Amino acid sequence: TRQKAMAQYVFTMNRVGKIVPPKRHILKDVSLSFFPGAKIGVLGINGSGKSTLLKIMAGVDKEIEGEAVPMPNMRIGFLPQEPQLDAAQTVRATVEEGLSEIFGAKARLDEIYAAYAEPDADFDRLAAEQAKYEAIIATSGADTELQMEIAADALRLPPWEAKVANLSGGEKRRVALCRLLLSKPDMLLL
């Protein structure tokens, strides 16, 4: 029944603790649960465990006491304090990573369309696969270019062709945030 009670929450932590050498408790006996749509802030002085808490929630740090359980199939988006970006990429290429599922679906759809022309094509299998990828595109919004432009403008991103290597720390963080938002996570950790 405990599993049933947890199902109404999008995320639950039960008696979570984190110890780092030499036996320093960063988090101790933390229990919390979030309902869908909750907006929660975590406040504390430097070194009090805020970033550690977010890493645990994101599933990045699994070496903990207790349990941290997201709702099944929940997509968690996490923006670390120092986002890791490929310095050789452009701003556009980095932001497009947030839409990789859609771009992948579009590419696979093109392959499916071409496969219909093959003499031994399995139309039933192709039609089923086509429906799956068309559904991904339909639910994510067909106009990815417009989504990217709106997000880039809202976050005041540098020009698309700018290299990540030449960006300031704040610009890199905004590019990483744009990529994360476009991936449309169910839970966002900033």
Predicted regions, residues:
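ABC ATP-binding cassette signature C-motif
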Residues: 1-190
